[in-house]
């Protein structure tokens, strides 16, 4: 079993990297790939860089070069659903773009022409994440839609606009839809597991700086449990 894990920033990958045995590292086109072993499973850890272009380029390299069995995209996110708090974890049911608009040509808001409006996470991986989360009793774990855009969501007007477009949205961030889109094109199963570093629109820039490390700890904890339980 070959498992790929993608995080955008150093803070989002460093804990998992330290857990890998026999680790080797290489950089391709500015993307950092670390291969190693955790719980007798081969793991490819990708530090993709921030934003959709970086995520798409690095995920393409990952899938073409390493051909993993499945992909987990992890790291931090901004909470959107009213039930969520900083530190909570969101498991994706599906992933969408929140900054794509070709509705004038009768596409759904967020839909890239020629592709589905929503990239649906693999059911088995969602179940694996949910079952692994049962071992974590001090963090709320939710399941729902995650949306991606190339902007940090601290503008209340933008938050209100996205909330209107996606009323049941759980979290926002800057890479997952690009990762999911590439996985869709390659036919590779994926799931997104994100911990909340902030609540979108509510002094989110201050909260992000304060709670990024906590979010990374929580999301990595769940990812490690998922890898351990993978058959």
Swiss-Prot record:
GO terms for biological process: L-methionine salvage from methylthioadenosine; L-methionine salvage from S-adenosylmethionine; nucleoside catabolic process. SUPFAM superfamilies: Purine and uridine phosphorylases (SSF53167). Its EC number is 3.2.2.9. It comes from the Bacteria. The active site is at residues 12, 198. Keywords: Amino-acid biosynthesis, Hydrolase, Methionine biosynthesis. One of its GO terms (molecular function) is methylthioadenosine nucleosidase activity. Pfam families: PNP_UDP_1 (PF01048). GO terms for cellular component: cytosol. It catalyses: S-adenosyl-L-homocysteine + H2O = S-(5-deoxy-D-ribos-5-yl)-L-homocysteine + adenine; S-methyl-5'-thioadenosine + H2O = 5-(methylsulfanyl)-D-ribose + adenine; 5'-deoxyadenosine + H2O = 5-deoxy-D-ribose + adenine. Substrate binds at residues 78, 153, 174-175. Pathway: Amino-acid biosynthesis; L-methionine biosynthesis via salvage pathway; S-methyl-5-thio-alpha-D-ribose 1-phosphate from S-methyl-5'-thioadenosine (hydrolase route): step 1/2. Belongs to the PNP/UDP phosphorylase family. MtnN subfamily. Catalyzes the irreversible cleavage of the glycosidic bond in both 5'-methylthioadenosine (MTA) and S-adenosylhomocysteine (SAH/AdoHcy) to adenine and the corresponding thioribose, 5'-methylthioribose and S-ribosylhomocysteine, respectively. Also cleaves 5'-deoxyadenosine, a toxic by-product of radical S-adenosylmethionine (SAM) enzymes, into 5-deoxyribose and adenine. This is 5'-methylthioadenosine/S-adenosylhomocysteine nucleosidase.
């Amino acid at each position: 079993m070959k498992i790929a894990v993608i995080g955008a920033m150093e803070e989002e990958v460093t804990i998992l990297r330290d857990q890998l045995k026999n680790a080797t590292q290489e950089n391709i086109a500015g993307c950092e790939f670390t291969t190693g072993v955790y719980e007798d499973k081969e793991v490819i850890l990708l530090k993709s860089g921030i934003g959709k272009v970086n995520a798409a380029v690095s995920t393409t390299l990952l899938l073409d070069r390493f051909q993993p069995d499945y992909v987990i995209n992890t790291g931090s996110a901004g909470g959107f659903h009213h039930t969520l708090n900083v530190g909570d974890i969101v498991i994706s049911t599906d992933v969408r773009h929140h900054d794509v608009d070709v509705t004038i040509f009768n596409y759904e808001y967020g839909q890239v022409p020629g592709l589905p409006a929503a990239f649906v996470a693999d059911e088995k991986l969602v179940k694996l994440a949910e079952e692994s989360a049962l071992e974590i009793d001090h963090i709320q774990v939710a399941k729902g839609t995650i949306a991606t855009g190339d902007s940090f969501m601290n503008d209340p007007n933008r938050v209100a606009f996205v909330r209107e477009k996606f009323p049941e949205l759980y979290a926002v961030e800057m890479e997952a839809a690009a990762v999911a889109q590439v996985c869709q094109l390659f036919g590779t199963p994926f799931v997104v597991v994100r911990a909340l570093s902030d609540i979108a629109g509510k002094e989110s820039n201050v909260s992000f700086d304060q709670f990024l490390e906590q979010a990374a700890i929580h999301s990595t904890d769940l990812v490690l449990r998922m890898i351990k339980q993978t058959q």
